[in-house]
Curated annotation (Swiss-Prot):
Organism name: Neomys fodiens
Keywords: Electron transport, Heme, Iron, Membrane, Metal-binding, Mitochondrion, Mitochondrion inner membrane, Respiratory chain, Transmembrane, Transmembrane helix, Transport, Ubiquinone
Record flagged with keyword Iron: yes
Topology relative to the membrane: Multi-pass membrane protein
Description of how the protein assembles with itself and partners: The cytochrome bc1 complex contains 11 subunits: 3 respiratory subunits (MT-CYB, CYC1 and UQCRFS1), 2 core proteins (UQCRC1 and UQCRC2) and 6 low-molecular weight proteins (UQCRH/QCR6, UQCRB/QCR7, UQCRQ/QCR8, UQCR10/QCR9, UQCR11/QCR10 and a cleavage product of UQCRFS1). This cytochrome bc1 complex then forms a dimer.
One GO MF term: ubiquinol-cytochrome-c reductase activity
Protein name as it appears in the record: Cytochrome b
Cofactor binding note: Binds 2 heme b groups non-covalently.
Taxonomic superkingdom: Eukaryota
Cofactor(s) listed in the protein's UniProt record: heme b
SUPFAM superfamilies assigned: a domain/subunit of cytochrome bc1 complex (Ubiquinol-cytochrome c reductase), Transmembrane di-heme cytochromes
Amino acid sequence: MTNFRKTHPLMKILNNSFIDLPAPSNISSWWNFGSLLGLCLVIQILTGLFLAMHYTSDTMTAFSSVTHICRDVNYGWLIRYLHANGASMFFICLFLHVGRGLYYGSYLFLETWNIGVLLLFAVMATAFMGYVLPWGQMSFWGATVITNLLSAIPYIGSDLVEWIWGGFSVDKATLTRFFAFHFILPFIIAALAGVHLLFLHETGSNNPSGIPSDADKIPFHPYYTIKDILGVLLLILVLTSLVLFSPDLLGDPDNYTPANPLNTPPHIKPEWYFLFAYAILRSIPNKLGGVLALVLSILILALMPFLHTAKQRSMMFRPFSQCLFWILVADLITLTWIGGQPVEHPYVIIGQLASILYFLLILVLMPITSLLENNMLKW
């Protein structure tokens, strides 16, 4: 009798994806983040579902419903902080996952990479709308500032903003629709993640050397299931430590003040994971230019396959490209720091230089360095 997992139509899909999947024998812990992102998504959907049972998307009661969750609902504080800090863990895993893809040339799997870029946009949209829901000061003003950016679009801009708001300002209609979108998007993300995996399994995984590994494959289970469990344990350790010891470490104190349209906070800023893009937006004095730079700072990832000039796929054996990669990482950390600072003298110019360097590295320096490395190898 043939094995049940290999014959049953549903089990066969799971078997070919997680059990008998041929995987390269040399993939490192940098390949753990896909499964960790899946875990983050499950945590977010479950905690979000339980939060939605007690939350009300009305401007009059949204803030107090979140207070009610934290004070009166059994373990409501735990669910709320797991959800808030789970988003931070999600983005940490996302950035590391994308960074891994850039370093090892995984972007040459075009369909997988493009679905990944789409997933990144979807997760960012979901996180932004989720941040608006508690209806604190930073929720309200963050929503006002970011949605207002669309007014920079020529001709249709102002109409588009009012259409998204559902009125002439961020109000009840905006909050209700943001809640609806915030609820539905994670399920769309889950479906997209399935498509992401589908395309990945068409080609098989990349590996640190960037060399095809068809001659040397091992089954996913038990080798990488065990390896993934280590990552899972570390993720849970970090998340529970954050939630139980300093749940507000990554949040903004302003969001503990109910939204007040008549009182603008001194420094409007998004959550930490958007600060790099926010710094790029602020570094350009022109509104439309800033919005374009903001979108391009993420969309530039879709250009990566076309900017790949190296003869080798991975950066493993390309020390000069490695050097530029780590400069890019340092640049993004600098932008993240700048995004959280007020708009005054030293910070403005640092932000502008860091923004120029970001685009310069990706569009000019890295492709040229790759060509130089090709010549050094006499290829």
